Amino acid sequence: HRLNRRQRQMCIRDSNKTVSVGTLALADGSNGGLAANYTLSGGTHQLTVNQRPLNATLARQYDGTTTAAGSDLSSFDALQGGETLTMTGSGTAASANVANGIAMSSNGTLALADGTGLASNYSLNSTVINIAQRVLNSSGSKTYDANTDALAGAITLSNLVSGEALNHSGTATIGSANAGSYTITNLSGISIACL
C-alpha cells in the first residue's frame, strides 16, 4: 500500500534539531493505501540536511608560482541566504601562467572556514584560480634633447617576479621636453618580450 503526503511545509531552524511535523498531512494513495489507517502522531520523524557543495574561485596576479592560497578567495557559487564564508590553507594550481579557471593539481590544505555562515553546512566541491597579468612599474632618466620621447633604453621595468627578466622596446612619452620629473605616458608604445 502506498500513501501520498500533502505538500505542506515543515520548518527546520538549525542543524541537529528535532523536526516538527507542523502541517504535514497524509492523503490516500495507491494500492489501497488509506490515510485514515495511519497517523503521524507518536511516530519518529527525521530529516537529514546534507552539506551543500560549493565551487570556489581564487584570484591573484601572476607571481611565478603554482601556489593557490585560500586568502586569494574571490567567490563561491552557491552560498545560501546571503551567507559568507572564507577559506584557509593552500593548494597547488595546474599552471603558474596567466589564465582563467585553472584547476588544482592538488587541493592541499584548502578548507572552508566560517564567515557569517557555518562552514560545516557546506562542502568544497572544486576550486579554480584566475591568474591575472602582473602589473609592472617603469622609471628612467634621459638627458634633455628638446623632445618628449622616452625610448625603451632609458626606461627600467620593476615589479618583475624575482629571477625573471624581460626585453622591452619602443618609445613612450613624457609630459614635457624640459628638465624635470614627469609621468611616463603612452606606454602602449613600449612592447615587452621574453629574453
What does each model-found stretch correspond to?
Residues 6-9, 13-195:
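Short loop/turn motifs that initiate or flank beta-strands
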